[in-house]
Structure formats: C-alpha cells, structure tokens
Amino acid sequence: MAMYLGLDVSDKTTHLCVVDEAGVIGWRGVCATDPETIAKTIARHCDDVGRVVLETGALSAFLYHGLAERGVPVVCICARHAKGVLSARVNKSDPHDAEGLAQLARTGWFRQVHIKDSATHLDRARLKVREQLVRAHGAMRNQLRGLLKLFGLRLGSATTPAKRVERLQALFGQRPELEAVLVPLVTSLAALEAQSAASSRELKRRAAADPVCARLMTVPGVGPVNAMTFKASVEDPGRFARGEDVGAFAGLVPRRFQSGERDTKGRISKAGDAMLRHALYEAANSLLARVKRDCALRRWGLALAQTKGAKRARVAVARKLAALLHTLWRTETSFRWA
C-alpha cells in the first residue's frame, strides 16, 4: 500500500507525518532538517512511498534537490495554496501542518512548483548581490548628501568617484571638523561603488557570452541585467504554453473578481516573481523613455500612455515584453524592427 508523507520544514527540525491511501495516520515524527537524515527517516518508516510533499520556503530548493538525488519522490507545492487548507484547523502546530501536507500529498489537490537547478540559483544569487550593492550604494550616497546639507554644504553633480573626492576635499576645506566624521562613510561608499561596478561588469560579461541572453538583448530596452534576470527566472521556456503566461507568472496581470453578475478587474496581482517583474518594468520604461529608434511596440506604448497614463503604459508594455522575450527564446530568433 502506498504511503504519503508531509514535511513541515523549519530551520533546524522537520516534522514528518505518514498517511495511507485511506488517510489514516501511520506514523509521526521529527528529525533534523537535512536531506540525508530525512531520506533515512522516510526509508525507516515507509516501505512504499507514493509521494512526499513540502512547501516552498528558504530551504525548499536545497531539500528538494537533496531528496530527489536520494530517490525520494518529492513534490514542492506553493505555500500560499497550502495555507488555505492548513488554516482550516482550529489549532495550528507543526505536527498538524505536517499531517495536512500529508493529506494533500494523498489527494493530489495541489499545484506543483517548479524548482530551479543549482546553476540557475547561482545566477539569481549574482543578480541579487548586484541589486543589494546598487541599493546600498544609492542609500549611502544619499546619506552623505543629506549629512553635508545639514551644514549648508552641497556635493553637487559629482558623477564619478574622482570628481566626488575632489569635491569633498573642497568641502572639507570649508568645514575641517567634518572630515573625521564622514571619512568612514566616504570610504565605505567608495568600496561599495567598486564592488557594484565589478558585479555589473561580471553580469555583462556573462550575458554577452550566453546565446540566449544575447538574443534577448536584441529587443530594445532589454540590457544584460534584464536578459539574465529573464533567463534565470523562466529557466525553461517550455514551462509556459503561451507567451502571455509569463506576464501572469511575473504578477503583471490584473486581479479578477467574478461573482454572479459582478465581474471586476483590479490592480496587477504582484503575486509572481518580483525580480522578473521589476526587470520587465525597467525594460519597458527604458523602451518608452530612452530608446530613440522607433518600433511598433514603442509606438503602441506611447499611444497608450496618452490615454491611460505613463504607469499603466509601462505595465502593459512589460507584459508585451514578457510574451515577446518568451517567443524569441522558444523560436531561437532575434528581434526584428518594425
């Protein structure tokens, strides 16, 4: 008889629950959150494993790949979907959640989540590191400007590190007591700037060497970071039957509420991959605001901005870009200007 397991994962321990085909609990337990330990625990208590279910979370990719490599038929499901079932219980606890996940594994009433491979997660880590460096650099630069303004000093348009150092030396000449106070901030800012630039160069190099990214970058407004983000987020274009589905995956489609005679559409869901959504929005903004060469997509977006507003136009163009990039990737073709 096939047995079904639910894994409620926390940072140090994982609660397990085993149910049979009738939903009767066969065993409960807890073990360390480690693929080897979990696999051995499952083998010790289950002879015939039908399906093992765990929720999405910080450790889900690590556990999924570790269990799959050890021959465990593991499935990862969306935590937001599982919450609707697990929240029906009056009392919330880790053992109860493991039991609920085991029942979901038995019934098959869930939507499986695609787990990216290690190479893709490495690319996403590179993108995240660059994003954090850019944000930290911007915040520190604004902090420096704000502190100088407290004393009536203005940094001005110091666009390069050399110009900023030159300008700061002039300002410290006016208020010498500020130099000792602000030197740690200035030094940290320079280090962040160097690391951010190095990270951007590495991403550009990798994007230029990647055939898929090079093809995606033929689309106006799509740069190396946008292309790498799209590739690392979608990973496999065959996951989506239509290009329009990528926009929904990125959370760029409006929410819908239909009941009886009422059928309304709200704001975009923002329920998908936030990194991909931001990259598509940035590419759309670049296409509408910075690209000078005319094309059909740009004309359509600018016309929409005249009637619906700039923000809605950017979102609409971002949806179009998602479908376009997916099509170019799937068909292995480059962008043709029209």
Residue ranges and their predicted role:
Residues 1-338:
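A detector of single, family-specific signature residues
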